[in-house]
């Protein structure tokens, strides 16, 4: 069956749960960009209420930290009502996807983009695909990417790998992302910590 599956509640990882990071990078607000990944109503709707609320709250804390520290904020969002050509192979795994209506497309209220934020149309798993994210980062002298959003083992992880592949240091915020299950979530953060990123918590970003 295509589409987002039914999601059962699970606890987000805490600092005590995180996998061991091979890299030893530190976030520098002068070098970083925050990526708010696919935090649209359509994608958040399947999440259990408590899980959704916690992820949105943590992402909003990071969003505020970015504003307070001069860190550019980038948003990915699918356009909705994609044509067959635009949808491509996505439809074989995820069906037709969201409609172009605000009920599907809007970023949730606590994370509403602000003037000056970078708004990127999302076409495939990676935030870098067919967007100017890399060019914007290079033009602004930024070589670190902090990632929050959904879904951890799909677009979030692929965007993390793509950042790494372009020599951008990714920081994956383990309690500001969500997934289809605890197992998918842990798979994503374990892969990231051992292969391409620093896995951290919201408190480590904002404190």
UniProtKB/Swiss-Prot annotation:
Reaction(s) catalysed by this chain's protein: isochorismate + H2O = (2S,3S)-2,3-dihydroxy-2,3-dihydrobenzoate + pyruvate
Keyword Ion transport on entry: no
Pfam family, one: Isochorismatase
GO biological process per UniProt: phenazine biosynthetic process
Keyword terms of this UniProt record: Antibiotic biosynthesis, Hydrolase, Virulence
InterPro entries registered for this protein in UniProt: Isochorismatase (IPR016291), Isochorismatase-like_dom (IPR000868), Isochorismatase-like_hydrls (IPR050272), Isochorismatase-like_sf (IPR036380)
Region forming the signal peptide: none
EC number: 3.3.2.1
Pathway membership: Antibiotic biosynthesis; phenazine biosynthesis
GO MF annotation list: isochorismatase activity
Purpose: Involved in the biosynthesis of the antibiotic phenazine, a nitrogen-containing heterocyclic molecule having important roles in virulence, competition and biological control. This isochorismatase may remove pyruvate from chorismate during the formation of the phenazine ring structure and/or stabilize the phenazine biosynthetic complex.
UniProt family annotation: Belongs to the isochorismatase family.
Protein's UniProt name: Probable isochorismatase
Species for this entry: Pseudomonas chlororaphis (Pseudomonas aureofaciens)
């Amino acid at each position: 069956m295509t589409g987002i599956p039914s999601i059962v509640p699970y606890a987000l990882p805490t600092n005590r749960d995180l996998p061991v990071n091979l890299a030893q990078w530190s976030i520098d607000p002068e070098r970083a960009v925050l990526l708010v990944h696919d935090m649209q109503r359509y994608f958040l709707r399947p999440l259990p209420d408590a899980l959704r609320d916690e992820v949105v709250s943590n992402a909003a804390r990071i969003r505020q930290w970015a504003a307070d520290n001069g860190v550019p904020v980038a948003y990915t969002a699918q356009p909705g009502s994609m044509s067959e050509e635009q949808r491509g192979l996505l439809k074989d795994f995820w069906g037709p996807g969201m409609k172009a209506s605000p009920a599907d497309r809007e970023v949730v209220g606590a994370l509403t983009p602000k003037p000056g934020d970078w708004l990127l149309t999302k076409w495939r798993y990676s935030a870098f695909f067919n967007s100017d994210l890399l060019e914007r980062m290079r033009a602004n002298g930024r070589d670190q990417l902090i990632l929050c959003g959904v879904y951890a083992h799909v677009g979030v992880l692929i965007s993390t790998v793509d950042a790494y592949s372009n020599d951008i240091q990714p920081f994956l915020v383990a309690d500001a992302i969500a997934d289809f299950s605890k197992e998918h979530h842990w798979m994503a953060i374990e892969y990231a910590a051992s292969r391409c990123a620093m896995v951290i918590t919201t408190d480590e970003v904002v404190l």
